[in-house]
A protein has these predicted regions:
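N-terminal helix initiation/capping motif
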Residues: 1-35
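Short, surface-exposed secondary-structure edge patches
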Residues: 8, 41-45, 61
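Hydrophobic core residues within well-ordered beta-strands of beta-rich domains
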Residues: 13, 26, 52, 64-66, ...
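Short conserved beta-strand and strand-loop elements enriched in small hydrophobics
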Residues: 15-20, 49-64
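Short beta-strand-centered aromatic/proline hotspots
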Residues: 28-29, 66-73
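A generic structural motif
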Residues: 34, 70-74, 93
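Short, solvent-exposed secondary-structure boundary/capping segments
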Residues: 39-42, 74-91
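Hydrophobic beta-strand positions in extracellular immunoglobulin-like domains
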Residues: 56-58, 70, 91
């Protein structure tokens, strides 16, 4: 069994997200979420410490809109197509 050091439980989801950055809007998909942050799959992840504004399309109701900061990211690799680009973000409530 893996030792997960997270303090808050995460839920697996598949919610579309629009990320507003200093360079414009980027589309992605939230694949897991907690009260403190989320993992977002996208073609061109931002780098750690970059700030962004998220608009997450929830299945019911109004979208979640929140400022966030990138904690870590994984870039696509031309040598390994099993690596999925994405990033972990922390919500700035």
């Amino acid at each position: 069994m893996l030792n997960d050091k997270r303090s808050y439980a995460r839920s697996s989801v598949r919610w579309p997200v629009t990320m507003i950055t200093s360079n414009g809007a980027v589309e992605g998909e939230t694949t897991n979420v907690s009260t403190l942050g989320a993992y977002i799959r996208c073609q061109k992840p931002l780098y750690p410490a970059e700030s962004l504004f998220l608009k997450v399309e929830l299945p019911m109701g109004s979208p979640l809109q929140v400022f966030a900061e990138v904690v870590w990211s994984t870039q696509a690799s031309p040598e390994d197509d099993t690596i999925r680009p994405g990033m972990g973000v922390r919500f700035l409530w």
